Amino acid sequence: MEMTSTSLKRGCLVVEDNDSVTPHDETKKQKVSEGCLTSSQDGVENDGLHRSENEPGPPEAESTVKDDENSSAQVQEEEEEEEEEDGLSEAGEEEEAESFADMMKHGLTELDVGICKFVSSHHGFSGILKERYSDFVVHEIGKDGRISHLDDLSVPVDEEDPPEDALTVLTAEDRQQLEELQLFKNKETSVAIEVIEDTKEKRTVIHQAIKSLFPGLETKTEDREGRKYIVAYHAAGKKALANPRKHSWPKSRGSYCHFVLYKENKDTMDAINVLSKYLRVKPNIFSYMGTKDKRAITVQEIAVLKISAQRLAHLNKCLMNLKLGNFSYQKTPLKLGALQGNHFTVVLRNITGTDEQVQQAMQSLRETGFINYYGMQRFGTTAVPTYQVGRAILQNSWTEVMDLILKPRSGAEKGYLVKCREEWAKTKDPASALKKLPVKRCVEGQLLRGLSRYGMKNIVSAFGIIPRNNRLMYIHSYQSYVWNTMVSRRIEEYGLRPVPGDLVLKGATPTYIEEDDVDNYSIHDVVMPLPGFDVIYPKHKISEAYREMLAADNLDIDNMRHTIRDYSLSGAYRRIIIRPQSVSWEVVAYDDPKIPLFNTDVDNLEGKPPPVFASEGKYRALKMDFSLPPSTYATMAIREVLKMDTSIKNQTQLNTSWLR
């Protein structure tokens, strides 16, 4: 039976997306995956803009010369700002919560970013992914197909771990003092442990126990008033822990400790920064396959260079909303993008659909899938969409780039951002506007700092102060906007079947569907390009639609190379329809809107029984499980089920009604 498409005619709101993403360089060659047929299109999807430890400096225009003194000053400024901003996060979160609903009144809708078609013809219904992040759980799927779970908190024993008697020679008080010394939690520079039964064997065991259990500490024996003491200390002060390569490391271990990170309501980079601070190491010794967003419970694999499992396990005593486990030692780190995808468990509360509607919707999702649109978080949550900034970059309209980022905007923001924008509009003085920002690591602060350093006539270099992945986010957003719009046009014109002139991939090579082989393909094989200098376009009406859309934005589809190499994008290919794997669902009845409707990994570790549901209840919820390849958006799958607008602007209205 031929599938038909359904246009979006109803406005509502549902969910905040928590899809995982993997930042990559857009200019890399196309790579094939089921979701997006390149590793270069994932961009930076999280709402927050994060500093990278390894970010290169600004792209240089022809007239720009590297300035080592400025670079050193920048590092010093950033270190001072990190200390300055430590106490600001909680207050900022409170203010953000108060202004969120107002801010969303000025946000985007799906229609604004080209999202307007559906696959299934079933009747839509409403449902809410509540503000509770626990209704959205993401488990990473490795290349081997294994779904990451936190189900083991034990520490592996290797050949060079201390013998059992070494673990008993230190009292609980000794261990606490040594741990505080190791993590610089007290002002002491050493810890002295008296040797009660003074024998060489006993002293040796204590030395071994301290060095094994507390890497980074050195020991020596001292005589004090006729008594023997083992004294533990940092060999090189605070720098000792900053370079784990200098620590003693058992030869039997791989250099990397792999572990499962379970986190609640915290994005991956924030979690790694927390671990780094506790361990007193740089964030860049951690590696991972993809980042997971904040508003969810997520489980993923992390690797860290030469930090012992025992030391990581100790952190479970003091971490909030984070838990580490499933430790193992491996020879290699993890690589970005080296994952098969993610498994989602999603609860949609207070659904209005009948059991028959739910059945039709979920069967369609399992059998046909959903349109592989870029989700709403790709385009930002404020009155200035990220794709508008990206378009200005591609147009070389640098004054417009500066204005779009810094100008006052409708909708509520954090108070200090409002004051900063007002100061900028009034004075056009970057130094003066920068003083209004207590948090200077935001994109506005980074741009203002660049303008202060390079001047108003060198906006290119000033913009280059912003970390590279965050700069590329803007142009990826524009590409995504074009792709969404063109896919909607393609489905409007030709429906959900392959036609001659469509593109498919043979391996990594794009090829056209011809008249005589159209029956050899399905809609799931069809790809469409993101605009760039190294892609081809369909051989039908949609090719001209691409050209017209870019021309309307003063861009030449035949000349997508930019004068600045970073902004020259090769393009990529992306499947237009995705069929989720491992799809299952159930409708449950409940009375209390606050109760959890399934167990998390931590619940299972703690032995909590799974929730029991009554046959009838005040409300009904749809619990969905499904797996998606990388670079696909779970909200777009949920949108297909509900037939509703997933923009936060619409979601805010529905959630407000639900909470009354």
From Swiss-Prot:
It catalyses: a uridine in tRNA = a pseudouridine in tRNA; uridine(13) in tRNA = pseudouridine(13) in tRNA; a uridine in mRNA = a pseudouridine in mRNA. InterPro entries: PsdUridine_synth_cat_dom_sf, PsdUridine_synth_TruD, PsdUridine_synth_TruD_CS, PsdUridine_synth_TruD_insert, TruD_catalytic. GO terms for cellular component: nucleus. It is found in: Nucleus. Its EC number is 5.4.99.-. The modification Phosphoserine is found at S7, S126. It is an enzyme of class 5 (isomerase). PROSITE patterns: TRUD, UPF0024. Belongs to the pseudouridine synthase TruD family. Interacts with SIRT1. This is Pseudouridylate synthase 7 homolog. The lineage of its organism: Eukaryota, Metazoa, Chordata, Craniata, Vertebrata. The gene is Pus7.
